[in-house]
């Protein structure tokens, strides 16, 4: 009961052409079996995080239908709970529809959480991680905030809508900035972090006072000098779904058996809602391609 989980919605800089007009990225079909949001929720429930808040900015229907009460994610039915939370004031100008505005609209629900720590993960990135281990690494280090990052060597042509971390030799975070595509080796920030709930709430309030356009990443970047913010490296498969090419590439990459092994582990199930429908029949004249 040390931490509760937050699954955040995608930022205003992220847009998957042709698909996001109808549903949020978390509700996108993935590998023909899952939805993208299954990965962060399964990571949390596998890590014994039983209280989870899923934030939805717009077009909630498909996420609500898929996630529902969350029973299919193996959440403890007595002590656990999955909440779907919405932004009350969806602004016409998208620049103000930030994660901070969504948290502010649901401050009452946040304030009621009795857990000392909060683990935040995005609904638009695909990876496997033991959040319990991540939380203990954070507590043992004595840092104020711990951010998860993935080291990549193709940042010039990929991850262009992601943020990257500036790290010192001790893995202290000096900056969180947009990836400008000017360097191939970068530490991509996975929009995943852990901190004390108390600090999280105070950062939300401070961001609100600074600017209505501020995101959690913006306020964390401001705090790099005054707070002890550290980075922890993620190993294994990682995909950030922030535009159509990255969505296609993530699905295709997992046709590779080695990549699939990095994401799916025998003792780390990815839960999803099952829909029992008639199986597809392929006849002699069918032409099927990947």
Description of each model-found segment:
Residues 1-31, 42, 47-49:
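N-terminal nucleotide-binding beta1-loop-alpha1 segment
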Residues 1-9, 198, 208-290:
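Left-handed beta-helix
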Residues 33-54, 66:
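A short, N-terminal amphipathic alpha-helix
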Residues 53-57, 148-150:
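Short internal beta-strands
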Residues 81-164:
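Conserved beta-loop-beta/alpha segment of the NTase-like Rossmann-fold superfamily
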Residues 128-207:
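Conserved core of the sugar-phosphate nucleotidyltransferase
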């Amino acid at each position: 009961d040390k931490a509760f989980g937050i699954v955040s919605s995608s930022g205003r800089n992220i847009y998957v052409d042709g698909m996001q007009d109808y549903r949020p990225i978390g509700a996108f079909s993935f590998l023909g079996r899952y939805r993208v949001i299954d990965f962060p929720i399964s990571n949390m429930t596998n890590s014994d995080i039983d209280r989870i808040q899923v934030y939805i900015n717009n077009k909630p229907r498909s996420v609500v239908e898929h996630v529902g009460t969350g029973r299919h994610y193996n959440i403890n039915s007595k002590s656990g709970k999955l909440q779907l939370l919405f932004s009350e004031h969806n602004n016409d100008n998208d620049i103000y529809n930030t994660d901070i505005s969504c948290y502010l609209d649901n401050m009452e629900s946040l304030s009621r959480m009795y857990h000392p720590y909060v683990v935040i993960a995005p609904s638009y990135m695909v990876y496997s991680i033991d959040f319990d281990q991540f939380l203990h690494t954070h507590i043992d280090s004595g840092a104020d905030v711990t951010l998860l990052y993935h080291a990549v060597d193709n940042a010039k042509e990929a991850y262009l809508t992601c943020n990257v971390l500036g790290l010192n030799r001790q893995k202290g975070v000096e900056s969180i900035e947009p990836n400008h595509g000017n360097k191939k080796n970068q530490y991509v920030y996975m929009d995943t972090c852990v901190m004390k709930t108390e600090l999280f709430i105070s950062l939300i309030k401070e961001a609100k006072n600074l600017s209505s356009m501020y995101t959690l990443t913006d306020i964390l970047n401001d705090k790099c000098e005054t707070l002890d913010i550290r980075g922890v490296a993620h190993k294994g498969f990682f995909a950030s779904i922030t535009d159509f090419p990255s969505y296609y590439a993530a699905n295709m990459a997992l046709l590779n058996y080695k990549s699939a092994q990095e994401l799916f582990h025998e003792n780390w199930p990815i839960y999803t809602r099952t829909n029992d429908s008639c199986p597809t029949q392929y006849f002699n004249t069918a032409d099927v391609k990947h």
